[in-house]
Amino acid sequence: TPMQIPRGHNVWAAEAIKKEVSIPVFATGSITQPDFAEEILASGKADFISMGRPLLADPYWAKKAMEGHPEDISPCIRCNEGCLDRGNHIGKSINCTMNPTLGFEDALAIHPAEKPGKIAVVGGGPAGLKAADTAALRGHEVTLFEKRCLGGYLHEASFPEFKADIRDAMKYLITQVEKHGVKVVKKEAVLEDLEKFDGVIIAAGSVPAGLPVPGADRENVTLAVDALKEDGIRPTGNIVVVGGGLIGTETAVQFSLESANHVTIVEMLPEIMRGCSDCDHIVYQDMIRKNHIAVYTSARVLAVEEEGVAAEIGGCRRLIPADHVFLAT
């Protein structure tokens, strides 16, 4: 099951079966954390815990749990990108978002550097954190520059409660950097900062694209990522999300859950969530239906006007009422 489904969703079944049989019963289904697994066993709901994806994310899951170091477990975030989608649905060899060495354990094994040096990493998002940690494990003296806060856009990605699993990934990556002695500098790196290092890794991330149409600079038009945080913008009423990729879809779902908003997705491609995982498609399509989110595909935005978003839909110009517009292009 994907991260949008509660963890341990099959435990009730294991508990019910255990009451009726005299043989050992296994509980399974999104049991990703040691404390949760222990809680199930201690409560008598099951005799054993069965897991699959967590062992792909970290094959030493059980060892680290047994030794009392759950903070060192690379967590399964139930994204299903590399395992279920790639393995089951596409028929390719599996990989893992949280474990880049999966399937390449020999080729990507971490060995001490032949010549340890001073390494700078620019950017404290997931790529920068992983690069800094890997360099530190190889024996380099690592300094990580981050102008905002460690985790980068993982903060926005994990803001919706239905994506809380990503918070585990962020906590793990930050913990490993701290444990392995990476020096963190909270500032934007400039050339003078980097000249003294033997090597520089650029992991500065990307900047969301805008919308090159008239009215895109209106006060009620903002980037979708500006809403996905604690102090983010919280408009109500008619909300239009321009862009039906994963970020746009998640933004629309989030606002449909927060209040009695009327939310609309406008996507220029023939379908929303193009290129996203099958699991995300299934879950979000269901949430879109349940929360009555309107979706326009093959729709080209022409302008953002005072009354709403003007778009070309089916060869005709149409005005979609909007009190606020979020860009997820």
Where do the language-model regions lie?
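Hydrophobic, well-ordered secondary-structure elements that form the walls
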Residues: 17, 40, 52, 177, ...
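Short loop/edge segments at beta-strand edges and connector loops
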Residues: 170, 185-189, 223-225, 297-299, ...
